[in-house]
Regions:
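Cytochrome P450 core scaffold surrounding the K-helix E-X-X-R motif
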Residues: 5, 76-81
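A long amphipathic alpha-helix within ATP-dependent nucleotide-binding catalytic cores
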Residues: 12-60, 108, 112
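Conserved metal-phosphate-binding beta-hairpin within the catalytic cores
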Residues: 44-77, 86
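Cysteine/selenocysteine-centered motifs that mediate thiol-based redox chemistry or coordinate metal-sulfur cofactors
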Residues: 96-113
């Protein structure tokens, strides 16, 4: 009964029916997982993303992954999609922030070397 793509109200309007939907871990085959990881890593490099990014995928009616968008600068807020995805990977919010900052620090140190 919901539209297939979330709009503005899904993130910012507490009266939206999307507001209380929970993010859950996707149950994907090993093959699909490998494809997604390889694709994200390749795109991360080709798009010259730095330190972190968020890749949003959807499966079509045949179960084929389709890239919805690449967000090279997703929000760091504690209740945002990036933090939710980190939590699903058993990464705490403080640990997520630390990983982002460490990545930037390593990149900057490498650039200066």
């Amino acid at each position: 009964s919901y539209p297939r793509i979330c709009g503005y109200e899904a993130k910012w309007d507490p009266s939206s029916p999307y507001w209380n939907l929970r993010s859950v871990r996707a149950h994907l085959s090993e093959e699909v997982q490998r494809f997604l990881v390889a694709s994200c890593l390749k795109l991360f490099g080709r798009l010259k993303c730095r330190d972190y990014a968020r890749f949003d995928w959807r499966l079509d009616h045949n179960g084929t992954p389709r890239l919805l968008e690449v967000n090279p600068n997703p929000g760091w807020c504690w209740d945002g999609h990036l933090a939710k995805m980190a939590a699903l990977a058993d990464i705490s919010y403080p640990e997520m922030l630390q990983k982002i900052l460490q990545s930037a620090e390593h990149r900057i140190c490498d650039e200066k070397a």
